[in-house]
Amino acid sequence: MSLPRCALLWARLPAGRGAGPRAAPCSALRALVGSFPGASGRVPCLAASSSASGGSKAPNTSLFVPLTVKPQGPSADGDVGAELTRPLDKNEVKKILDKFYKRQEIQKLSADYGLDARLFHQAFISFRNYIMQSHSLDVDIHIVLNDICFSAAHVDDLFPFFLRHAKQIFPVLECKDDLRQISDLRRPPNWYPEARAIQRKIIFHSGPTNSGKTYHAIQRYLSATSGVYCGPLKLLAHEIFEKSNAAGVPCDLVTGEERLTVEPEGKQATHVSCTVEMCNVATPYEVAVIDEIQMIRDPARGWAWTRALLGLCAEEVHLCGESAAIDLVTELLYTTGEEVEVQKYERLTPISVLDRALESLDNLRPGDCIVCFSKNDIYSVSRQIEIRGLESAVIYGSLPPGTKLAQARKFNDPNDPCKILVATDAIGMGLNLSIRRIIFYSLIKPSINEKGEKELEPITTSQALQIAGRAGRFSSHFKEGEVTTMHRDDLALLKEILNRPVDPIQAAGLHPTAEQIEMFAYHLPETTLSNLIDIFVDFAQVDGQYFVCNMDDFKFSAELIQHIPLSLRVRYVFCTAPINKKQPFVCSSLLQFARQYSRNEPLTFAWLRRYIKWPLLPPKNIKDLMDLEAVHDVFDLYLWLSYRFIDMFPDSSFVRSLQKELDVIIQEGVHNITKLIKISESHKLLNLEPSGSQSRLPGASKSPARRTRGTKTGNKAAEPPSPSDKELPLASRLVQQGLLTADMLKQLQKEWLTQRPEQGKEKVGTRRKKKDPNSD
């Protein structure tokens, strides 16, 4: 052991009780090297640093996940602290630590350094475990503990060691100011220097559906020397791509899963049609068109419209959308010094809300479209229409684009016997449909609130107008549109919703970039990506015109692949891949793709064929059809990743060919969807939990029933209406709200029969009798 080290250790030996003959030399050495901070027996006064709490917003410390600091094992040099002083008595040390924990002064000082009650408790538990479980402690803390045992030091002298340990398990304490600066989102216009370097002309084309607003913007786009169209859907991007090239204007297509070039040798065309997330904000254009600008408020995707609005480098930027976005867009562009020219349009064809509901599917006429908000309602209505000897086309969100277009062509074809359309709100944009009358099967739509909880609420005015506006389109066979509801008692509510003014949009969405997350990870290297996102959102500073978009889907993917060794940038890209987290096969495919990538094993066409067990057979029931839709989504995922990691996903052209084959198989299944529903019901593979509206399909029963609002997806076959208006009001509400399923209700009924035979026999018997018509 070196002499300086010996001097330092001897200088820290206790000068009080038990020091014996070594007290004098110890005092002399302390005079040379100085005493340990805090040896005066009071709370040490440490210099404030960036780790001290500060800033305008206190962080949500529940997001700080403590790291693990392992206790020290046996040292090769032995327990030097014990050699120079004495071995520590664990019982005495525990008493000292407990006393330290209970000190109000220590808790207050900890709070000054960002350790609130929760963090203080967690840090202390870790600190205590570290000290109690270590074979040998660092010499300095060993000596201080020994000094405290002999009353030569104060218990508060442990604070520097405690704070050091707290910063080890909560590294965010060291860099809060840096993190706040990184997550400062208060000046988004400054992120786009190319756009700020020019004076853009902004034209807002405002009007309802079928007013020609997008048409006028596209005409300017086609006449420009260069242009970019940014749409919300792949279908819309494809439509403009085809229209542009048909008009003799060379146009490329860019979506997340597809790139199409029309110029020879892959040369970039003067025009490009893309989904809004894919627009290039560094490329200069003469004209840019941003469609459906009101989606800037979308909780998940709004950031893409904000980025396009503020960042597109175009001499003219044409915005198409609802008037509700005018004020916000004007305010946002005021900060860039750009003025907004507003051009308002009126609907080209009249539309009227009928005074009578449909009430019965027997009253359907050619050109009718029944809008449902769940697949189960789609299946049930389609089956009821088929029973009446009518053909219907079916469109819902999870269908592949090719299948949607095929069903739209079938419905629009005047020579096709299919004259009825059953669809979800997926028809609200992206499809040209010849609809005469929109019939709302229900006005209740499931939605996800800010807390990620499922809610059943009436559709908004904006949603109702978007869907209703599909009736009587200018380019369709029907020059006048009509709107009504399936059920009589929904009609008044529909009129009320449609007559409400659309609430002005208050804020635009923002999203952290990969670079910002990388900087966070630099400061918090041991933190998971999901936790990094939580901390970023918590630290983010935005002004009243913006909000941070919901990142639950991103976090879901991050947690799914967290255990797979990937670089942060690669992990970030995988997490931004658009997947349906409700599809187990798609989620497991993302996991498998990430695992293959981490092993540096390319995902070849042959590997993918084996993985999905190609060839796939035509669907025999609804479950088979849903499985095929999931495989189609897996192909989309592969293609999306192939444009980000070309070497690891090398066979995009083969996969695209395979996807087209699958699209044909799915189209065949959807064409025969009523047969699939019938087979599924007969084999008990499809159990449809009726919503209140579904359970009262006209013709299903002769007795009228009370309307139960809501669209509830579940696992029970469609039932005839209740025979009594007063029966089971509470149970109906609970099922409607998603708090009970039909199976749970059955079980409760059985328990009521067992536990309260006298009280429950009559009512339960009535319920059971009601379900007899559907029993096998």
From Swiss-Prot:
Q: How is its activity regulated?
A: Helicase activity toward DNA substrate is inhibited by micromolar concentrations of 5,6-dichloro-1-(beta-D-ribofuranosyl)benzotriazole (DRBT) and 4,5,6,7-tetrabromobenzotriazole (TBBT). Helicase activity toward RNA substrate is inhibited by elevated concentrations of TBBT. Inhibited by some ring-expanded nucleoside analogs.
**Where is the protein localized?**
Nucleus; Mitochondrion matrix; Mitochondrion matrix, Mitochondrion nucleoid
What InterPro entries does this protein map onto? DEXQc_SUV3 (IPR055206), Helicase_C-like (IPR001650), P-loop_NTPase (IPR027417), RNA-DNA_Helicase (IPR050699), SUV3_C (IPR022192), Suv3_C_1 (IPR041082), Suv3_DEXQc (IPR044774), Suv3_N (IPR041453)
User: Which reaction(s) are listed as its catalytic activity?
Assistant: ATP + H2O = ADP + phosphate + H(+)
Phosphoserine, modified sites: 722
The UniProt record lists the EC number as 3.6.4.13
Quick one: where is this thing mainly located?
nucleus
For the Helicase ATP-binding domain, which residue ranges apply?
A: 194-334
Composition-biased stretches (Basic residues): 766-776
Q: Where is the transit peptide?
A: 1-40
- Keywords assigned by UniProt, alphabetized: Acetylation, ATP-binding, Helicase, Hydrolase, Mitochondrion, Mitochondrion nucleoid, Nucleotide-binding, Nucleus, Phosphoprotein, Transit peptide
Return the annotated region ranges for Disordered: 689-733, 751-776
Gene Ontology molecular function: any one: ATP binding
Q: Where is this region: Interaction with LAMTOR5, important for protein stability?
A: 650-776
Q: Which PANTHER family match?
A: ATP-DEPENDENT RNA AND DNA HELICASE, ATP-DEPENDENT RNA HELICASE SUPV3L1, MITOCHONDRIAL-RELATED
- Role played: Major helicase player in mitochondrial RNA metabolism. Component of the mitochondrial degradosome (mtEXO) complex, that degrades 3' overhang double-stranded RNA with a 3'-to-5' directionality in an ATP-dependent manner. Involved in the degradation of non-coding mitochondrial transcripts (MT-ncRNA) and tRNA-like molecules. ATPase and ATP-dependent multisubstrate helicase, able to unwind double-stranded (ds) DNA and RNA, and RNA/DNA heteroduplexes in the 5'-to-3' direction.
User: How is this protein organized at the quaternary level?
Assistant: Homodimer; in free form. Component of the mitochondrial degradosome (mtEXO) complex which is a heteropentamer containing 2 copies of SUPV3L1 and 3 copies of PNPT1. As part of mitochondrial degradosome complex, interacts with GRSF1 in a RNA-dependent manner; the interaction enhances the activity of the complex. Interacts with LAMTOR5/HBXIP, WRN and BLM.
The name under which this protein is listed is ATP-dependent RNA helicase SUPV3L1, mitochondrial
The record lists the lineage as: Eukaryota, Metazoa, Chordata, Craniata, Vertebrata
